[in-house]
Amino acid sequence: MLSKFSKYIMIGICLIFSGKSFSQSDQLLQDLGYLIDDALFFSDKYITPATDAAVYQSSSGWVYSAKKRKLWDVTVGVNTNFFFVPNSDREFQIKNSDFQLLSIESGATSATVPTAIGNGDQIYLAGDLDGEPIRIETPKGINQNVVIYPHLSGALSLWYGTEVLVKYSPRVNLKRSEYQVYGFGIKHNLSQYFKSLEANKINLAATATYSNEDVSFDFLDIQTDFGNLGINRLSGLVDTYQMQLNASKEYKKIEVLAGFIANVSDFKYKLTGTKGAIEETIPLQYILNQRLKEIYKTKANFMGEISGRYQISKIFIQSTIAFGKFVNSNLSVQYEF
């Protein structure tokens, strides 16, 4: 963490290079430094469960089939994803001792508030900014037990049992949030090298994928005598690199798959809402985005996946469940050209 002196220097430098007035009091600069620290603490606790969940949402449902397909076969899928929100990640506790400028308005020393994937409960935090009182309503969660969103996927079969995979979701508006994912990958059939497996309709495949997840949530709408602070939209940006192994067994028109998934995700956070009126005085959104780099993180996940795929002529219906820390399900209707 930056020292108090370093925080004030950062704010001062930003003021100088942005061409803004530098007539603000030392008290204002100190209070803004404290407010930035408080916002940073709350941001981490609030959005991290949602970005963890986004990894699960994007990680499952990549593999249609583990078997080797014919050259230039094309499959297009329309998918509906179901993410089951766990109780353990819906809320977190805050204490007055967690904050430097703010405190719980009710007079309590601690309170429980929702994460981004929690309920719609809210409390008020209060403090003084350069001697002027401010009052902040904590952000709501999405207040859903199951998060449902659609996405498209596709696969193109190339030479030697290799396929190119793609996944794309337009920006989907969920309750008080937005979600978007895109990604691509390569799958290679391994059972082609073991004739005994092919003879028994047992298939093996290895897959490597990359996906980008972007989740955004309504955040803190803070009104002050200096204008709106412009931190009312918080985004989590996640890059996920994934490897998985799948095995399947064919039973006439049914293919049953089981898989093991391992991935590494890089998490970044950014304020993406409209800049507030305070930007005429201090480039607060820029300063906060620089400070948000302090909570960037990298995490590894391991999960299992089971899937069933049923063929009706050129149409396939597939249901997939991935499980680990979270549970995520995907229902896909595919057409094979």
Where are these regions (language model features)?
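Repeated loop/turn-to-beta-strand initiation elements of outer-membrane beta-barrel proteins
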Residues: 160-164, 193-196, 253-256, 312-319, ...
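Extracellular/periplasm-exposed beta-strand and loop segments of Gram-negative cell-envelope proteins
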Residues: 89-91, 128-144, 173-179, 212-240, ...
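Residues that define the transmembrane beta-barrel architecture of outer-membrane proteins
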Residues: 70-72, 145-150, 178-184, 200, ...
